[in-house]
Amino acid sequence: MTGMSREEVESLIQEVLEVYPEKARKDRNKHLAVNDPAVTQSKKCIISNKKSQPGLMTIRGCAYAGSKGVVWGPIKDMIHISHGPVGCGQYSRAGRRNYYIGTTGVNAFVTMNFTSDFQEKDIVFGGDKKLAKLIDEVETLFPLNKGISVQSECPIGLIGDDIESVSKVKGAELSKTIVPVRCEGFRGVSQSLGHHIANDAVRDWVLGKRDEDTTFASTPYDVAIIGDYNIGGDAWSSRILLEEMGLRCVAQWSGDGSISEIELTPKVKLNLVHCYRSMNYISRHMEEKYGIPWMEYNFFGPTKTIESLRAIAAKFDESIQKKCEEVIAKYKPEWEAVVAKYRPRLEGKRVMLYIGGLRPRHVIGAYEDLGMEVVGTGYEFAHNDDYDRTMKEMGDSTLLYDDVTGYEFEEFVKRIKPDLIGSGIKEKFIFQKMGIPFREMHSWDYSGPYHGFDGFAIFARDMDMTLNNPCWKKLQAPWEASEGAEKVAASA
């Protein structure tokens, strides 16, 4: 609970919206709601995946960010060209902490920035020849790359360059997979369309290449981890549990993933989807074309991890189900010790979240395992099926906010007064300057992993370290304290 009744939260929403002109106020009102877990269809009370109001300080990203920054960028043995001006590639380089195994610049390229560095003359005369030359240079300088993706920035779509033709010609010439991705930033309303475009590019240019490959030896226990970007090593801590219960992870993508793993994914028996929002499209495609079932899972916190492990094991035979219970029993003392240590220090603390992807709902259980309560949550780029899932996880009369503006978020925080905020880098310093403990929940504030039982110990430590840091008791300047004491003495 927010500590406020349903009527009070509804009143708060209206108070915050009062500053807007009528048109903007009506639009934003549709994106804010008081949660009711009994509601089965979120569209009855909140809308999402709509264009942000011009002039409002949205926290969203663009389609290029969704494609290059999320889906394609972490594939380690491919070179991802930011085709356009230098800024987009530079500002999206290495920011998400997608861990990988490999030698950077030799057989892994995740943290490097490859750009066609568009200039004015390229806008005037087109950049197809420049792109072809760049691909040749990349092949000469980095011969161990296994493929190339061309991530289009805004000017490419505006001037009508034919990146598909260049990719086909150079791919045939070099006998290498070269994938054109039409992810210009102006497309769609957020980075969500970039995810979809990237999924479609995987479908059209990568999947199917090894369908006739008979050298791959399948087993009944082959799975693929999809939609885990290995931030801080998340995919590794998840993979440990799956392999301990007897499953074989043929592919994980895109964090620490390779193009070969993606090509082999149609041969697995089950696709395990962590980030539903960014990877449900390709999972549905593989279900339709190859008959591969898929399921969501949640490895944040022991309660949800155990639920997910059992749900995954139920898709296989009794031997896997038995090993699953053995894995759960093995790690039980470990996570119980974490709860015993940190729950007394965190019990009753209230959290507000504003993130993207899956986290606004997936991390709720991890906080609850520590005795904390999420009193407000929202997504940057959700669709209504995300809110359908979220409303069941949130308590009654808690606050939901879609594409929340900087102003709205600050005002909600001032009134609800959470003990902790989990959001992104753009919000971090605003709330820290307000004296509110904050965790950057896009890339784990240079920490992690947070997935699985191992990750839960780090998650709990980080929340305790943030909330119970003695610095929050020292925010008042010494001269302000002395002035206050003088006033008290004078009044006495």
Curated annotation (Swiss-Prot):
MF annotations from Gene Ontology: ATP binding; iron-sulfur cluster binding; metal ion binding; nitrogenase activity
List the record's Gene Ontology CC terms alphabetically: molybdenum-iron nitrogenase complex
Cofactor entry: [8Fe-7S] cluster; [7Fe-Mo-9S-C-homocitryl] cluster
Instruction: Tell what triggers its expression.
Output: Constitutively expressed during log and stationary phase in sucrose-limited cultures, its levels decrease during stationary phase (at protein level).
The record's Gene Ontology biological-process terms are: nitrogen fixation
Spell out the disulfide connections: none
Q: Which SUPFAM superfamilies match?
A: Helical backbone' metal receptor (SSF53807)
InterPro entries the record matches: Nase/OxRdtase_comp1, Nase_comp1_asu, Nase_comp1_CS, Nase_Mo-Fe_asu
Entry EC number(s) = 1.18.6.1
* UniProt-reported outcome of changing residue 195 to Q: No nitrogenase activity
Q: What is the residue range of the signal peptide feature?
A: none
Q: What are the UniProt keywords, alphabetically?
A: ATP-binding, Iron, Iron-sulfur, Metal-binding, Molybdenum, Nitrogen fixation, Nucleotide-binding, Oxidoreductase
Gene3D superfamilies in the cross-refs: Nitrogenase molybdenum iron protein domain
**What is the activity-regulation note?**
Nitrogenase holoenzyme is subject to 'conformational protection' by FeSII; under oxidizing conditions FeSII binds to the holoenzyme and reversibly protects it from oxidation.
Task: Give the residues the record marks as binding [8Fe-7S] cluster.
Answer: 62, 88, 154
What does the note under cofactor report? Binds 1 [8Fe-7S] cluster per heterodimer. Binds 1 [7Fe-Mo-9S-C-homocitryl] cluster per subunit.
Residue sites binding [7Fe-Mo-9S-C-homocitryl] cluster per the record? 275, 442
Q: Does the keyword ATP-binding apply?
A: yes
The UniProt subunit note reads as follows: Tetramer of two alpha and two beta chains. Forms complex with the iron protein (nitrogenase component 2).
Task: Extract the NCBIfam families matched here.
Answer: N2-ase-Ialpha, nifD
What is this protein's function per UniProt?
A: This molybdenum-iron protein is part of the nitrogenase complex that catalyzes the key enzymatic reactions in nitrogen fixation.
Query: Sorted alphabetically, which PANTHER family does this protein's record hold?
Result: NITROGENASE MOLYBDENUM-IRON PROTEIN ALPHA CHAIN
* Listed name of the protein: Nitrogenase molybdenum-iron protein alpha chain
According to the entry, what is the taxonomic lineage of the organism? Bacteria, Pseudomonadati, Pseudomonadota, Gammaproteobacteria, Pseudomonadales
